[in-house]
Swiss-Prot record:
GO BP: autophagic cell death; DNA synthesis involved in DNA repair; negative regulation of cell cycle G1/S phase transition; negative regulation of cell growth; negative regulation of cell population proliferation; negative regulation of intrinsic apoptotic signaling pathway in response to DNA damage; regulation of G1/S transition of mitotic cell cycle; response to retinoic acid
Gene Ontology MF term list: cyclin-dependent protein serine/threonine kinase inhibitor activity; protein kinase binding
Predominant location category: nucleus
Protein name: Cyclin-dependent kinase 4 inhibitor D
Organism of origin: Mus musculus
Entry-annotated residues carrying N-acetylmethionine: M1
Compartmental location: Nucleus; Cytoplasm
One Gene Ontology cellular component: cytosol
Length: 166
């Protein structure tokens, strides 16, 4: 990787991390920075973006950023959005092809991460498309994880989706 490529990747990642959609647009449209340019840590702007800024995610995705890029631990932007509870950003990612059944290095789906953090709106959004029978590295399905955590509200959401015939 050339130093010049890293510099533009750092600039795009920095703007995305700050949630600066105007600078992201400028870099993508005027300077023609590739939306998947890597920063000095080998991450793309979508991986380091401010997840509370769905406009940044939308701009990167509209310009061709990969919604399923994973870091060394197998974490993708959809995992991060689910874990942090940013539903609007998660919706943008999914609308642009993010895989809600992607596994991270612990075998967790994004819905597992949302359950661990207690994000009921994220669980409600992910449940219809998630593999609710998938077991993470601890051997737990999403429902079993919710039960283990004593999260009755999440259990109710999951059970409602498991009763719907496919």
């Amino acid at each position: 990787m050339l130093l010049e490529e890293v510099c533009v990747g750092d600039r795009l990642s920095g703007a995305a991390a700050r949630g600066d959609v105007q600078e992201v647009r400028r870099l993508l449209h005027r300077e023609l920075v590739h939306p998947d340019a890597l920063n000095r840590f080998g991450k793309t702007a979508l991986q380091v973006m401010m997840f509370g800024s769905p406009a940044v995610a939308l701009e990167l995705l509209k310009q061709g950023a990969s919604p399923n890029v994973q870091d060394a631990s197998g974490t993708s932007p959809v995992h991060d959005a689910a874990r942090t509870g940013f539903l609007d950003t998660l919706k943008v990612l999914v609308e642009h092809g993010a895989d809600v059944n992607a596994l991270d290095s612990t075998g967790s789906l994004p819905i597992h991460l949302a359950i661990r953090e207690g994000h009921s709106s994220v669980v409600s959004f992910l449940a219809p498309e998630s593999d609710l029978h998938h077991r993470d590295a601890s051997g737990l399905t999403p429902l079993e994880l919710a039960r283990q955590r004593g999260a009755q509200n999440l259990m109710d959401i999951l059970q409602g989706h498991m009763m719907i015939p496919m």
